Swiss-Prot record:
It catalyses: agmatine + H2O = N-carbamoylputrescine + NH4(+). This is Putative agmatine deiminase 2. The active site is at C356 (amidino-cysteine intermediate). It comes from the Bacteria. The keyword Magnesium does not apply. It comes from Listeria monocytogenes serotype 4b (strain F2365). Pfam families: PAD_porph. GO terms for biological process: putrescine biosynthetic process.
Amino acid sequence: MGQLKGLPVEDGFRMPGEYEPHIGCFMIWPERPDNWRLGGKPAQQNYKEVAVAISNFEPVTMFVSPNQYKNARKELPDTIRVIEMSNDDAWIRDYGPSFLVNDKGEMRGVDWGFNAWGGLLDGLYFPWDKDNQIAKKVCDLERLDYYSQKDFILEGCSIHVDGEGTLVTTEECLLSEGRNPNLTKIEIEQTLKKYFHVQKVIWLKHGFYLDETNGHVDNIFNFVAPGEVVLSWTDNKSDPQYEISRECYDILANQTDAKGRTFMIHKLHCPDPVLITQTESEGVEAINGTFPRQAGDRLAASYVNYYTANGAIIFPLFDDPKDKDAQELLEQLYPDRKIVGIKAREILLGGGNIHCITQHLPDKSTIRE
């Protein structure tokens, strides 16, 4: 158990698709008052609902700061493991480890650099040192060896893989000046191929409109299965999201995956624009060094930001008529999984959604055929 030399691609380790079997899910309990309104209490209820929903299908571990341990333990059912772990905020998908498996039933992690989505240039909070230690701590907890790439800034929400050699990301995020400004697009792509063991990287131009993380791919795109994808969509041509989604569609429609398959693309219509209310804005404490959210600001509300669990899809609800449409499409796309909707406005107010606040632990016995 410790830091490894070498590269995953040389050692035969790959990142599996999220739809492959899991042995668990990690989350972090929200609390910081400059991001979560009313001291995080409303968001904690949303996180609890997500954790309970996932726990019906796979084990859930909730990491929580020392200040919130008693509260989280009281709020969460005994079926959810609660472990004390210092943190700066509650987005484990972004700074938890990337988990890799091989065909021998072994698992390893990757510890990437994290700088709060842009560092001192356009990051969302400072400091971020506690978050930057979480990947290594989780690997230690799970007794996993890990590769360290601390000089390379990468968030888990910025990439999606199909487990069969294809990775999708956005130029808006990975080429942003606050991430890896000294690396070229080709150099970034080479790193992705070496550490995720993929043969093809597909670059979408942009992520979801006004996504404050510089356009994470998980808010606009997801793999349903190898060769089959879902894309956030709107038919409203006056909405800036329309041109973004259309551009993504055109890129995907003219690409093949690493196996040479053309993509079957499903359009998952996003809700009508969701805006922050005055009351919600006033409930967040204003602190220097954090990114303020004002009344009337549009939030990046997308149904694509869902979690694929063992036997289930946990997706966000926005109290919009399209909630029902999203449920119906997901039921068609995942006939063998239960589709569970969770009201997720409080998570959205914090800057992300269900996929962002969860990190799956793959089943290390997953073997590629």
